[in-house]
Amino acid sequence: MIIKLLVALIHYLHETMAVQSIITTPLLVILMSLRSYAFTEPSLHRQQPPSKGGVRAAYWPAWSDFSTSSIDTNYFTHIYYAFVQPAPESFNLEITESYKKWAPKYDGIHNIRPRVTTLLSIGGGGNNATLFSEMASSKQNRASFINSTIHVARKHEFNGLDLDWEWPGDEKDMSNLALLLKEWYKALVVEANTSRKSRLLLTSAVYFNSTISLIGNGPRSYPVRAIRKYLDWASPMCFDYNGAWANETGFNAALYDPNSNISTKYGIGSWIGSGVPAEKLVMGLPLYGRAWELKDPNDHGVGAKAVGPAVDTDGSMDYDEILVFNKDTGAKVVYDEVAVSFYSYSGTTWIGYDDGPSITKKVQFARSMGLKGYFFWAIGKDKDWTISKQASNAWGY
């Protein structure tokens, strides 16, 4: 009865848009966790036929040594070039020496068959969030940025533009994001009419949840109306749920988590519940895992104490690297049926990741929810296309 009352309360607060002003963050997290139980469990057996416009996408990191000419486009419909950045002060896209070096490698993608749709992605995880905030803060700044993106996209024959702003810092940023999307879309329509070319696509990578509440400056919600009206689709990044920033092991991209609201099911449900149609969502999937150094090698379950990352500075490991580690060390591999995720451990190293069976179920989940598609971060981490092929097959191709 108490849970029902709390669920009813948060539904009321959400509808009145008062949730962020009268509930403290800890209580908000508790209520959101309880609310996750109210979402209807999708049937993974009631598959929808893939839509004609279904998206099977992946990001190509420009710094990767993986050539675009080696991409098997049988498994993808869309490829993102990641990333370019706006310049300080002018907010025009910076065509740096690095970009000039990497762009020719990407240009070869136009010669691959079957053809794919290409998008230029702006921002990324290492972007200067303050710079994006400044860019979006005035009409003049937004216009400079928008005009520059269109110019660069047309010059290099991209089919669309993608915004990866990580992250809008407060509600003012979210309001300005709405204005940016509106003005950007209208500029794309005008340019298409003037050039007599197809309108450039406009998409955006977004937080896994429609409200950012666990990082940054307190809860702030994405501008759902603008996203629904002006984007071709939004791409929730359904990964990085756990990492070496917390000294205990956890899944990188749990589909379900009965104990919290940090899961793909909850995140996608929040986007749909906020008013973004399922057919405008492209769900993110990781081709990498997160590795910890265990505090005690005999304590190796989910939630085990750790002392930091096992590799690199952030503990990230490409899927191919994980397979090599598992084979070379004879690691114990465990599939968690509740989270729909894998983990492996050997000695003091513990890795949470996805493999073919979990990716297949996640793609089936996306289909059962009526989503527009899925995307991977990132090409080059699955060199023999093992997971990419299984995902494509699960989508129905």
Curated annotation (Swiss-Prot):
Family: Belongs to the glycosyl hydrolase 18 family. Chitinase class V subfamily.
Top-level class of the enzyme under EC nomenclature: hydrolase
SUPFAM superfamilies hit by this protein: (Trans)glycosidases, Chitinase insertion domain
GO MF terms, alphabetically ordered: chitin binding; chitinase activity; endochitinase activity
Function as written in the Swiss-Prot or TrEMBL entry: Possesses chitinase activity in vitro toward glycol chitin, carboxymethyl-chitin, colloidal chitin, and the chitin oligosaccharides (N-acetylglucosamine) (GlcNAc)6 and (GlcNAc)5. Hydrolyzes (GlcNAc)6 into (GlcNAc)4 and (GlcNAc)2, or two (GlcNAc)3 molecules. Has the capacity to inhibit hyphal growth of the fungus Trichoderma viride in an agar-plate bioassay. Involved in symbiotic signaling. Required for root hair infection threads (ITs) elongation and nodule development. Possesses Nod factor (NF) hydrolase activity.
GO CC entries: extracellular region
Mutant lacking the gene: phenotype: Root nodule development arrested at the primordia stage and defect in nitrogen-fixing symbiosis in presence of Mesorhizobium loti.
Induction remark: Induced by the fungal pathogen Fusarium oxysporum.
Reaction catalysed by this enzyme: Random endo-hydrolysis of N-acetyl-beta-D-glucosaminide (1->4)-beta-linkages in chitin and chitodextrins
Signal peptide range in chain numbering: 1-18
Lineage: Eukaryota, Viridiplantae, Streptophyta, Embryophyta, Tracheophyta
Record protein name field: Class V chitinase CHIT5
Glycosylated position list: N128, N147, N193, N209, N247, N261
One family name in Pfam for this protein: Glyco_hydro_18
Pathway: Glycan degradation; chitin degradation
Result, substituting E166K: Root nodule development arrested at the primordia stage and defect in nitrogen-fixing symbiosis in presence of Mesorhizobium loti
Swiss-Prot/TrEMBL keywords: Carbohydrate metabolism, Chitin degradation, Glycoprotein, Glycosidase, Hydrolase, Nodulation, Plant defense, Polysaccharide degradation, Signal
GO biological process: chitin catabolic process; defense response to fungus; nodulation; polysaccharide catabolic process
Taxonomy, superkingdom: Eukaryota
Residue ranges of every copy of the GH18 domain listed in the record: 54-397
Keyword check for Mitochondrion: no
EC number, UniProt record: 3.2.1.14
Source organism of the structure: Lotus japonicus
Record-annotated active site: E166 (proton donor)
